[in-house]
């Protein structure tokens, strides 16, 4: 793609998200979401591969459906209450429809069906944008309207997302699909606590973006998209393979890595809200997700591909291309847990 076109589309993606952030009127928020969708679509189909075109079509259809539901919900709320403000979502039918539309936009279960298939058809950098930046605008709207949405609906969406995110990743061999189910599970953790402590949702979102960015960038640098090729990476770049393994464990929420911090804080908040059953259910679903991350770690470190000619690491490995964003994201994805009290203090 022409660099000028790519820059224009990336600026439009940022403009759509910023417009949604800054809007207090439903039509402006809807317009920002639409600019975002229309700008990301050419980036998804830029390689003209049949899988990429198929993924782009699926993404466009689901996002268009969600946008129509948002427009219908906002019109219904304005008709029933006379208010177009985002903070005045008082009609229960409109609020439920609005939450369903945003759940479809960010891939919450049971509206998650498009996420793994779309991510599988994209390259790793576009998949990174889809998994991180594209979640910001819908989550901002959910945070603004969380107090008007039925708590039972949010709880069901949160638990089902963490369950589906863990269960769906068990049988996968493609790393992009595994990261898609990881995204679904992390969205569930954010939604479950959004009514009680929105600042914890922001902490979980920040750590999710850091860990997912580190995971996508390490996989891109090692040119790995399948579990079967993970076994060959250690002989090419042992340091990068070790980094990838630690980042995946951080995504799974294993202490003492960064990914444990949001889960620990969210479970603590749910316990404070006298919701021990929900906290226990969330902790158990996190174990399912941790299992398939450990499976990736096993394939990466303890297995050898039958196609390998040399079974030992050469004494001199090729120098990997340095990447400043990868170094920053990886460092943050592995070492932020000791700073948890300071981060919590800054957000409250």
Swiss-Prot record:
The chain crosses the membrane at residues 13-33, 60-80, 93-113, 149-169, 178-197, 202-219, 246-266, 274-294, 326-346. It is a multi-pass membrane protein. GO terms for biological process: mitochondrial electron transport, NADH to ubiquinone. GO terms for cellular component: mitochondrial inner membrane. The keyword Translocase applies. Keywords: Electron transport, Membrane, Mitochondrion, Mitochondrion inner membrane, NAD, Respiratory chain, Translocase, Transmembrane, Transmembrane helix, Transport, Ubiquinone. It catalyses: a ubiquinone + NADH + 5 H(+)(in) = a ubiquinol + NAD(+) + 4 H(+)(out). GO terms for molecular function: NADH dehydrogenase (ubiquinone) activity. Its EC number is 7.1.1.2. InterPro entries: Complex_I_Subunit_2, NADH_DH_su2_C, NADH_UbQ_OxRdtase_chain2, ND/Mrp_TM. The keyword Transmembrane helix applies. Belongs to the complex I subunit 2 family. Core subunit of the mitochondrial membrane respiratory chain NADH dehydrogenase (Complex I) that is believed to belong to the minimal assembly required for catalysis. Complex I functions in the transfer of electrons from NADH to the respiratory chain. The immediate electron acceptor for the enzyme is believed to be ubiquinone. This is NADH-ubiquinone oxidoreductase chain 2. The gene is MT-ND2.
